[in-house]
Every structure is written in C-alpha cells, then in structure tokens.
Amino acid sequence: MKKSYRVKKEKEFQQVFNKKQSCANRRFVVYVLEKPQQAHFRVGISVGKKIGNAVTRNAVKRKIRASLFQLKDRISPEIDFIVIARPGLEKLSSEEVKANLTHVLNLAKILDVREGIE
C-alpha cells in the first residue's frame, strides 16, 4: 500500500482519536474520521508492546496491511481511520486476521457493502 494511504503524523492520529467515533471486536479497535472531498482513504496502524517484541509487532502490521490491501477497493474513500491491534492477534493466521478486520470494518461502516463478501 502506498505511503499516501497512511496516517503518519501524531497530529493526524490525534484528530482521528479526538473524534471519538470507534468500533471494536475481540482483535481490533477502529477509530474513524470522515473527511469529505478526500481522494482516497488513509489508515494508521498501531500495534502495542503487549503484542510482543518488535519482530512480532512488525509481522502483525504486515498481516494487517496485506488484509487492507485486499480490501482497498471496498473501503470508502472519504475517511481516515486508525486500526489498533489487541493482544492475541499475533497467534492468528493471515486469513483469520482478514476475517476479523473485515468484521470490525463492517461494524464501523467503512466497507462498501455493494461489493459483496469475499
């Protein structure tokens, strides 16, 4: 996923957090900020130290990014959102990560339902 699709700066993260619009399941918390007239969505990924060491956290981030890449055509373009991984995610396969991420994105109404379920 291109860097233009990422929320990178702390100020941008804080804007999304301060909106306080969130959804969660057992594996993820997602914070959402609507940004009308934005060309494409932007995502920030946060994986805390409770998940494991740096190698484990980076592996989890790669799984999340890969899942988002597969879902990118279904994600609404006019939003910024932050995906926060919860402990236990490091034990899941890529398919399970994608299923959990799809579930929480549907709860947050980020995914376009017209495309159907993959």
Curated annotation (Swiss-Prot):
Enzyme class: hydrolase
GO aspect biological process, one term: tRNA 5'-leader removal
Gene: rnpA
EC number(s) per entry: 3.1.26.5
Function: RNaseP catalyzes the removal of the 5'-leader sequence from pre-tRNA to produce the mature 5'-terminus. It can also cleave other RNA substrates such as 4.5S RNA. The protein component plays an auxiliary but essential role in vivo by binding to the 5'-leader sequence and broadening the substrate specificity of the ribozyme.
Gene Ontology cellular component terms for the protein in this record: ribonuclease P complex
Residues of the signal peptide: none
Subunit structure: Consists of a catalytic RNA component (M1 or rnpB) and a protein subunit.
PANTHER family: RIBONUCLEASE P PROTEIN COMPONENT
GO MF term set: 3'-tRNA processing endoribonuclease activity; ribonuclease P activity; tRNA binding
Entry keywords, A to Z: Endonuclease, Hydrolase, Nuclease, RNA-binding, tRNA processing
Alphabetical list of Pfam families matching this protein: Ribonuclease_P
Classification via PROSITE patterns: RIBONUCLEASE_P
Identification of the protein by name: Ribonuclease P protein component
Gene3D superfamilies linked: 3.30.230.10
Reaction catalyzed: Endonucleolytic cleavage of RNA, removing 5'-extranucleotides from tRNA precursor
InterPro entries given in the database record: Ribosomal_Su5_D2-typ_SF (IPR020568), Ribsml_uS5_D2-typ_fold_subgr (IPR014721), RNase_P (IPR000100), RNase_P_CS (IPR020539)
Keyword tRNA processing: yes
Family: Belongs to the RnpA family.
